[in-house]
Swiss-Prot record:
<keyword id="KW-0810">Translation regulation</keyword>
<protein>
    <recommendedName>
        <fullName>Enhancer of translation termination 1</fullName>
    </recommendedName>
</protein>
<keyword id="KW-0597">Phosphoprotein</keyword>
<comment type="similarity">
    <text>Belongs to the ETT1 family.</text>
</comment>
<keyword id="KW-0805">Transcription regulation</keyword>
<feature type="compositionally biased region" description="Basic and acidic residues">
    <location>
        <begin position="17"/>
        <end position="31"/>
    </location>
</feature>
<comment type="function">
    <text>Required for correct translation termination and probably involved in regulation of hypoxic gene expression in association TPA1. Inhibits replication of Brome mosaic virus.</text>
</comment>
<feature type="region of interest" description="Disordered">
    <location>
        <begin position="1"/>
        <end position="45"/>
    </location>
</feature>
<dbReference type="InterPro" id="IPR024318">
    <property type="entry name" value="Nro1/ETT1"/>
</dbReference>
<dbReference type="InterPro" id="IPR011990">
    <property type="entry name" value="TPR-like_helical_dom_sf"/>
</dbReference>
<feature type="modified residue" description="Phosphoserine">
    <location>
        <position position="30"/>
    </location>
</feature>
<keyword id="KW-0539">Nucleus</keyword>
<keyword id="KW-0804">Transcription</keyword>
<dbReference type="GO" id="GO:2000640">
    <property type="term" value="P:positive regulation of SREBP signaling pathway"/>
</dbReference>
<dbReference type="GO" id="GO:0005634">
    <property type="term" value="C:nucleus"/>
</dbReference>
<dbReference type="GO" id="GO:0006417">
    <property type="term" value="P:regulation of translation"/>
</dbReference>
<dbReference type="Pfam" id="PF12753">
    <property type="entry name" value="Nro1"/>
</dbReference>
Length: 412
C-alpha cells in the first residue's frame, strides 16, 4: 500500500507554527484608581477567612487566571490591592506578617501580565509601548527578587521568576528584532537558562506549572520559525498543502536569536522531560491531565518529523534523494518509529470520550505510523485499519465533521 496522506493532524501542526499576535486590548476605560473590593466579586476557597487580605488577593489572581484574560481590569485591581497592603504594612505589624511569598508572587505576576496589554496599546506610540513593556517587566522582576530576598527557599517565587523570564524573552526582546538585527549584549540563551534554573514542577498548582511550560513551548516555536511569519501566514490561508512548506531562514551568527536556534534540540528535550514529569505528578482524573498528555504527544510527533521526512524520501525515492546505505535507512526508520509510537502513547492518554477531535489526533498518528512501517507489511495494514476505524467513529459521532479527512485517507 502506498504512503497515506497525513491529513488533518499534519496540517494542523504546520498551521500552529506561527507567532501569536497580541490581541487588541479592550476599549473599556481603565479602573486603576477604583477601590478593588467595591467593584468586583471574588470567589474564595470554602475554608478561607472572608477578612483574610491574602485570601482575597489569591481570589483576585485566580479570577484572572481562569478568565479569558482579555481585560486588564482585574490585574489593575491586584496591583492596587498589593500597593494598599504595602502602605498599611508600614504601620501595622500584623498586616506586614501576612506579606508572604504568595503576596510577592501574585504582585509580580500581575505586573508581568500587564505587559501584554501595554504591548497591545494601539493608542500609544511604538516608543511608549516598548518603554512600558520594559518598565513593567523590570518592576515584576524587582518585586519577585525582593520576595526571594525574604523567602529564598520559596518554590513558588522561583517559579514566578521563571515565568516572567520566559514571557519577557519573546514579548520584549524577540518582538523588536528583525532579520538583520545584531546585539552582542542581548544574551537570550543566558536568560533562557536563568529561567530554566528557577523552574520546577510545582505540585501545589499543576495548572500554573503547565502554563509556564507552554510558554517555553511557544518560545521555542517562535525561535524556530523566526523570520518565517509571512510564509507561515500564507500557508494558513492556502488550501494547497505543498504551499505550506516553511522557508528556511538563515540568520547570521551575530543575530541574538541565532544561539537560541542552535540550542533548540536540547531545549525541546528539556521541555519534553519536564512535561513528562508534570504528567507523572498529575492525577488522571484531573481535567488538565489530557492537555498535558496531548502536548507531549504533539512534541513527540514533532521530534519524529525530521527522521520521518528522511525515511519517506528514501522509501518513495523520486531520484532526488541522497544515496544512503540500507543500514542508514533502517536506522532513520527506527528512530522515526520510536518517536511516533511514543507520541501515540501520549495521544491515547489524551483521548476524551466526548471530544472526537482527540480521536482524530490518534488516527492521524496511526497514519504517520503506517507510513513509516515496511510497505505492504501486516503491521502497516493494521495501523491503517486502526486509523480508518477511529476516523469512522469520529466522523459518525461528529455528524460528518471529518468526512473530508476520511475520504482523503481512503483515497490514498
Amino acid at each position: 500500500m502506498a504512503k497515506r496522506p497525513l491529513g488533518l493532524g499534519k496540517q494542523s501542526r504546520e498551521k500552529k507554527r506561527k507567532v501569536e499576535s497580541v490581541e487588541k486590548k479592550s476599549d473599556e476605560p481603565s479602573r486603576e484608581s477604583t477601590p478593588v473590593r467595591s467593584q468586583m466579586s471574588v470567589e474564595l476557597d470554602d475554608d478561607a477567612d472572608l477578612d483574610d487580605e491574602l485570601a482575597q488577593l489569591k481570589g483576585l489572581w485566580s479570577k484572572y487566571f481562569h478568565s479569558d484574560r482579555d481585560d486588564e481590569y482585574v490585574l489593575n485591581g491586584i496591583v492596587h490591592e498589593c500597593d494598599r497592603l504595602l502602605r498599611l504594612s508600614e504601620e501595622d505589624k500584623e498586616i506586614k506578617k501576612t506579606l508572604n511569598d504568595i503576596f510577592h508572587g501574585i504582585y509580580a505576576l500581575a505586573l508581568s501580565e500587564l505587559t501584554i496589554f501595554k504591548a497591545g496599546d494601539e493608542e500609544a506610540t511604538e516608543e511608549k509601548r516598548k518603554k512600558d513593556v520594559s518598565s513593567f517587566f523590570e518592576n515584576a522582576i524587582e518585586r519577585v527578587e525582593l520576595g526571594l530576598s525574604h523567602f529564598p527557599e520559596s518554590q513558588f517565587l522561583k517559579l514566578v521568576l521563571a515565568k516572567i523570564i520566559f514571557q519577557r524573552i519573546p514579548l520584549e526582546y524577540i518582538s523588536n528584532l528583525h532579520l538583520k538585527s545584531k546585539d552582542k549584549k542581548l544574551d537570550l540563551v543566558g536568560q533562557l537558562e536563568h529561567g530554566k534554573k528557577h523552574f520546577s514542577i510545582y505540585e501545589n498548582d499543576t495548572e500554573f506549572t503547565f502554563e509556564i511550560l507552554q510558554m517555553v513551548n511557544d518560545l521555542l516555536d517562535i525561535v524556530e520559525n523566526f523570520g518565517r511569519e509571512q510564509s507561515i501566514q500564507e500557508g494558513i490561508d492556502s488550501d494547497n498543502e505543498e504551499e505550506e512548506e516553511l522557508i528556511d531562514i538563515e540568520l547570521e551568527p551575530e543575530h541574538p536569536v541565532y544561539p537560541l536556534q542552535q540550542s533548540l534540540e536540547a531545549n525541546y528535550e528539556w521541555l519534553r522531560n519536564h512535561f513528562d514529569k508534570l504528567l507523572d505528578n498529575t492525577n488522571t482524573d484531573m481535567k488538565i491531565y489530557a492537555s498535558i498528555a496531548n502536548t507531549l504527544g504533539e512534541l513527540y510527533l514533532k521530534k519524529a518529523e525530521e527522521p520521518s521526512k528522511v525515511f519517506l524520501s528514501l522509501q518513495y525515492d523520486d531520484g532526488s534523494s541522497k544515496k544512503v546505505s540500507d543500514k542508514e535507512a533502517k536506522n532513520v526508520q527506527e528512530t522515526a518509529l520510536k518517536h511516533t509510537k511514543k507520541a501515540l502513547e501520549y495521544l491515547e492518554k489524551a483521548k476524551l470520550e466526548d471530544d472526537p477531535d482527540t480521536w482524530v489526533q490518534v488516527a492521524e498518528a496511526y497514519i504517520d505510523l503506517g507510513n513509516l512501517l515496511d510497505n505492504e507489511s501486516a503491521e502497516q495494514e493494521e495501523a491503517y485499519k486502526t486509523a480508518e476505524e477511529i476516523l469512522g467513529k469520529a466522523n459518525k459521532a461528529s455528524h460528518g465533521k471529518f468526512q473530508d479527512v476520511l475520504d482523503n485517507f481512503l483515497q490514498g
